[in-house]
């Protein structure tokens, strides 16, 4: 089996880039995952100027997200996604990327699930029935569009003050580019989704997310070759041969491959460091989970499907990735003429063979013939929405099994570039630090694509969790320090 870097980099725009909807939930409970707060370097005179503006995401602590994407930890299988996608008594239906076993963790997966759920509802609903949809992300929006067009009475409730969920577009004062702190690029999208993006008037620009500029802590450019891909392939093959599923971290150790657990922060280039950088720019951004959490069998696809890994790699090399000028209009266009209630936090859903009801945190409730639930897996795992009666065992098992990963972005705008702006130097929009102790090691340079001096820092899994508790000033110090190896030294 061959796992190429490009396999994961089509998802590097997806780990946070191709996220899905946010739903409705009361205040966030204490998270079960904890990671030590990232160290903040001592500020020093640096060739990297202070950004003139920044926008940071906080999906891991967002009360209506509780994570960025779903993943399969040890013991979970794609069948758990299929189980969660099943309806209950033809009254309660589920959608969202976590329910899509073909394209989980992506906009396409969210789209697929919304289309599927709308079709399932239409197959059993009578003419003009009232359908309640919980969550105004992409899955909820496309389902609402399909059901309204089919003549159903659709009411969509969303906890936020806006639609879109983890499609979150803003354009703050002073920014000439749209800032998507959630889904920021489109990769691997099917024809229907791409057509809807264009129909919504969303501008797109091709962006090559496969080419990477790998740099050592001293600023020297590295040729990392296939070290990371080869080690991951070896680990997955070893894991697939075991009698039971083991964490990906254990598969690295057991296979004899270069082990990212042996990487030493700040040590510079080395095989373990190359593998760690490969995972930081790939698996961590597509799953939001660390090797110690990911299933070696299913965490990165089906490890037993030795003939499909190269096919995945080839598919990811298609020049289909595009940077958009903001994805929010996509959701807005889908919800045109749909009845949407914002700031409506759902606290309970009741159902029986006769119908369903939706209870809001305000104490109000309303009835519907059927309910479509599109909240993220992180929200479902909190039991914040109480189902009465409780969901069937298969659904509860699936919710417990599927993980909620964390991926964050940090958008930085500079008055001028401090990096080498020569054509050869900026040909790769992806930057990766190898063997660095920096808190943010993966970056996207938008200057070659947009002409604007904007960088996006990407962090996933434990790296993302370690930055959550930092203040804005602390995070900026971490970011500026991390970017020093990319700065041009005067003279």
Predicted regions and their residues:
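FAD-dinucleotide binding site
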Residues: 2-491
